[in-house]
Amino acid sequence: MRVLKYLLLFFTASAWAQPSADLVRQLREGGYVLYMRHTSTDFSQNDSRMTSYEDCENQRNLTDKGRAEARDIGAHVKRLRIPIGEVLASPFCRTMESARLAFGKAQAMNEARGGPAQPQDPSRYDGLKKLLSTHVPKGRNVVISSHGNPFHAVAGPPYLAEGEIAVVEPKGDARFSVVGRIRIEDWPSLK
C-alpha cells in the first residue's frame, strides 16, 4: 500500500510539471483547453443565499486582488501571443468576471461548472468531461473559467489554486490529459 502511495505521488507530480518554453510553444500552436480556476475570492462570502447566477450580492466574489490577477493573466496571454478562441465559464459571478477581465469575453455554460445535476449524480460531470475532451483546432485554444472542485472530480489531484490554469490536451470520447499547469506566479517568467 505504501508503494502505491509513492507511485501515485510520483505520477501526479510528473503530470503537473512546471511550465516551460515547450508548453508556451505548444499553446502558441493551439489545440488545447485552458481550464482556469477563478482568481482570488473573498472567503467571508458564500453562495448559500444566492437566488440565481445573476445574484452576485449573495455569492463569493472576486476581491480587488482577484480582479488584478485576472487582468494580469490576460496581459501575459497577450504578451506570449497565445491564441484564444471560445471562452466558456461557469455561470457564477466570480468565474464570469475572471474570464471577462482576463480574456474580454465569457459565454456562460452550466457544463463548465459540472451541473446542473444533483451533487451525488454520477453523470454530473459528463458535460465538463465532454468540454475537456472535445478537439480544439490548431491556431486557437479554448478557455474554461470554472471552479476547483469540478476539475478535481474529473482530473484528480492536485487541486488548482485560485487563478491557476491546467493545460489540457483533448483526446476525444471523454478522454483528455493534463499536460501542464500555470500558477499565477509562473506567468512573469514565461517567454
Where are the regions that the model predicts?
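Positively charged n-region of N-terminal signal peptides that target proteins for export
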Residues: 1-5
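Hydrophobic h-region of N-terminal signal peptides that target proteins for export
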Residues: 8-17
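Active-site-proximal alpha-helix that buttresses catalytic centers in soluble enzyme cores
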Residues: 19-110, 114-119, 157-191
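Generic beta-sheet signal
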Residues: 31-33, 137-146
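All-alpha RGS (Regulator of G-protein Signaling) helical domain and cognate RGS-like helical scaffolds
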Residues: 111-121, 125-133
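A short, structured loop/turn motif at beta-sheet edges
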Residues: 134-140, 171-173
